[in-house]
Amino acid sequence: MNPLTIFCLVAVLLSAATAHRGSNAIRNNLQPSGXLSPRELEDMPAINEITFEKLQEMPAEEAADLVNKIYHLSQMSRNIEPSYAPSPNQIPAYTYTPTGQRVNFNLNQLVATAQQQPNFGKQEVTVFITGLPNKSSAMLTANQKLVQAYLQAYNGRVQVQGEQGDDSNQDTSSSEESSNRPNGQQPKPNGNLVVIDLGAVIRNFEDLVLLDINRVGAAIGNSLVQLTAQADVPQEVINIVAQGIAAHVAGAAARQYTRQTGNTLRRITAMDPSKIYARKPNTLVGLARGNADFVDAIHTSAYGLGTTTRAGDVDFYPNGPSVNMPGTDDIIEASLRATRYLAETVLPGNDRNFPAVAAESLQQYKNNNGNGRRAYMGIAADYDLEGDYILQVNAKSPFGKSAPAQKQNSYHGIHQGAGRPN
């Protein structure tokens, strides 16, 4: 039976619940608490009628309720299997030369493209896997900010050639644009950025729901294996940053890399990892600690498009588990704030803009009852961090509070090398 047919049948026969969200606490994991009325089930749109544009137009709480109802129905049925898996020659990707020129290719051409770039992989390689399409200014801006941040960090550049967007209506500041603008000769590049634009082939919410995470992740993992074998890029310099559903794809890619090589990738950073709606029976799926040497996650729409489920060695919850973030009006923009926050930390001098402390809720953070040591969300996160961390953020850029974290009741551990590997 078609997965969508099963999904609709489940919606008629079963009832589910929306999540408790009032407590703003991590332990509250979207558990069912009541029943949907027959009228509510009847009024629910078909999955193929839901678009990212509609989710953006809806009030955040309303959109979150809809997404959570769909998620619970999918979990109760246990019959929704993934069926959408774009092939490597359908997934667009791009990288940049040291002068900022964009080089376009498809995923199946990654190795050939890398081999044409001088000194590719001699230093750090960051693979950015997008998880949402560039269908709005918020989506476009978030991705551009992250790309520009890495190019500034690696190549000393701010503006991506040929990609200047109109950000006149977007919140931005010098914290997202380094003050160290290039003067004269470009510095020698100290890293490479590869963007795997999976979001470009996630055309609608249905594609996201039915994405075959393990199959797509295995394809990306195989490409990374080839990058090591044929382009001499060692695993210890490969970091993945991934957005939404792509965070789980990154986990699958890293597991495939380990299966094929016996080695683990250095780091995976998840930017608001999403819920997982479809899965094959008796099959593990999703990002988890152990997929890389270090896995960190930033949750900015935990009760909306994202998930409260822990995804890494350390999970950061700005303003506590929430539907949205300060300064956002919808769950799409809230989810993308994780990308904006990471971008802010990538730029030189901003890596400690987001101090956090171990806590279970924003209230506990405010009451200074968090346990454990202080930490920094983003690129400077210590690789030995574990647990859940809470912090406060600003509504506009610069988003990081920048002030030192409050002194906690207990402090333990010694910093063992923060941020990117040497």
UniProtKB/Swiss-Prot annotation:
Subcellular localization, as worded in the UniProt entry: Secreted
Q: Does the keyword DNA repair apply?
A: no
Gene Ontology CC annotation, any one: extracellular space
Which UniProt key words apply to this protein?
Secreted, Signal
Q: Name one GO biological process term.
A: lipid catabolic process
What family does the entry list?
A: Belongs to the AB hydrolase superfamily. Lipase family.
**Name of protein:** Vitellogenin-2
Its gene is VG2-delta
